[in-house]
Amino acid sequence: MPPPAEEFAVDDLDEFESRLDSFLNRFHADDLRRILLPDPDGKLHFPLVIDFAELLEFDPEVAHQLYDYPKDVLELFDAAAQRALDKFDAAARRADKRKAGDEPMEKKFVHVRVNTSGSPLECPEASPSIGKVRVKHRGTLLTLKGTVIRSGGVKMIEGERKYQCRKCKCRFTVHPELEAGNRITLPASCKSKSAKGCGGANFQLIEDSITCHDYQEIKIQENIQLLGVGSIPRSMPIILMDDLVDIVKAGDDVVVTGRLSAKWSPDIKDVRSNLDPMLIANFVRRTNELKSDLDIPVEIINKFEEFWAASRATPLKGRNSILKGICPQIYGLFTVKLAVALTLIGGVQHVDASGTKVRGEPHMLLVGDPGTGKSQFLKFAAKLSNRSVITTGLGSTSAGLTVTAVKDGGEWMLEAGALVLADGGLCCIDEFDSMREHDRTTIHEAMEQQTISIAKAGLVTTLNTRTTVFGATNPKGQYDPNESLSVNTTLSGPLLSRFDIVLVLLDTKNKKWDKIVSSHILAENTEEKKGKTSDPEVMWTLSMLRRYIHYVKQHFKPVLTKEAERVISSYYQRQRQSGTRNAARTTVRMLESLIRLAQAHARLMFRNDVTKLDAIAAILCIESSMTTSAIVDTAGNALHSNFTENPDQECILKCDSIAYLSKNIKYLTDEISN
């Protein structure tokens, strides 16, 4: 067993407690008075959150003692908070401000919670990754970041018992040891504070002296994106008690501050017991709403604004400069790069009249021959997303994608799968065709309703999966353009209809295209190409793209204009009336997809209004998914789509094409003539 930390000791305990009282009275008097107010929920435990940075500035010595000996100092802090609470309560009673019958119940359990945000305790030494926690951290105040992968049920455990010595009648309190499975160990002799001591070893339990607490165990795992290739993400069990229980669920991103301890592994015959590390939580902060750790400086935002100010005359040319930063090692594939950008940016989630949430995250599927760059797009998209999970269809089961029920210590718990862990981010599934049909059907609800309903091992619950699904698959055998997409991919119609964009990449013979691509690949490895840094696309590096995508998602909530609404409505009506329409694709989901993609394009163009241009861009993405199209030359095969020299002029020609196809709808014809 590792050597225990030195015991907590101060020269003058009374003086130390008075310093704690001074801190609470100065900074948290209003919080304590608020706790005294009548509570409609009838809670027994009340948190009092203090700021470690504030404490460090007020009294550095107390702050250092709190870091070195959190268990002892937090007990003194709780006692100080209770004294202050009693003092304020007595003052209120003397002032006679309460009406008769308005007496609140006695509030005996106040817990001081330490928030280390913005303090020196966010340094790597006091806030290491889970995989770097060592014995030297034992007993200290530690802050860990991770994702909840397992959440146990709420239990009730004993918090303390009071005993009385049969010899001298001295009363004392005994606390259970969490490290030893909540076992209570009586002292060897009486704890009498008399000079001689009675030496008694026979104790009697005082009736009605047992205090119970809520108790929950969760497990958090370190962020996969921060690990190198081949590294296994480590996990750490966390103990939550009292007001901290049941505030997080599987899939949540959390920051946990607590005391690092250890517990004995379960007793198994002929197996050596070991000490497993665990964190006894003092404060838990959910960071789901703050998923991005990107700190975007004002200078970068000014660069974005200057870029679009310079591109005001030719906005589509500016958009293409951004798109060229996506997978720059792959030549061309304009349609795919545009689709990737729109998928990552996404639309705006809204609630319809019936109260049902309509998702804003689009889904995308790449269907293509081997060697067409599908996996490279998946990996690059994962790098652009602030939170992502990459998996393959062959190595994924329905439980691994959704939620697994695992048994731990005689109790069933839920362990989050890939879609739950990617909540608020991106889930990339390569080799989509390798998944079993049963496993594919389990993600239907996750893709459309963005939840997963679970009924396993007596556990019935619903978890959020607000994630974008980006899949890649190979066609079944030789791709046949005359057959439907469902036949070529062996994917069911209901699953295909959930993908907003389905792009087909066919490696067909094209002498001109092969020559251009080979020249591009060879030029990438020449000294002349390596020395060039004057390209306008150099601005859009991976880091800059991540910041741009995050910024436009947070600051732009585009709304459809009348022109965009009419364009989308006209196109949808024509698709529904077409005699050669694909029934699996031309559903109401197609209309919702058009709206999402148009909103995403408006965000990409740094706007809050969805214009006719955005609607046309969304239509072009949808048309590229079709087997045949009179609007897009590369329909049925997005591999040979390239960036044009004059995209703004090209857009006018596309408008003509869309108007021609929808000539039976008067509005579009009038728009083009104007």
Curated annotation (Swiss-Prot):
Reactions mediated catalytically: ATP + H2O = ADP + phosphate + H(+)
Subcellular location field: Nucleus
SUPFAM superfamilies: Nucleic acid-binding proteins (SSF50249), P-loop containing nucleoside triphosphate hydrolases (SSF52540)
Residue ranges of domain MCM in the record: 318-521
UniProt-annotated binding residues for ATP: 368-375
InterPro entries from the UniProt entry: AAA+_ATPase, MCM, MCM_dom, MCM_lid, MCM_N, MCM_OB, NA-bd_OB-fold, P-loop_NTPase
EC number of the protein: 3.6.4.12
Motif (Arginine finger): 497-500
Zinc finger boundaries on the chain: C4-type: 165-198
UniProtKB keywords: ATP-binding, DNA damage, DNA repair, DNA-binding, Helicase, Hydrolase, Meiosis, Metal-binding, Nucleotide-binding, Nucleus, Zinc, Zinc-finger
GO BP terms, alphabetized: double-strand break repair via homologous recombination; meiotic cell cycle
Xref: PROSITE patterns: MCM_2
GO cellular component term, pick one: nucleus
An MF annotation (GO) of this entry: zinc ion binding
Superkingdom assignment: Eukaryota
Similarity comment text for this entry: Belongs to the MCM family.
Stated role: Probable DNA helicase that may play a role in DNA repair during meiosis.
Designated name of the protein: Probable DNA helicase MCM9
Organism: Oryza sativa subsp. indica (Rice)
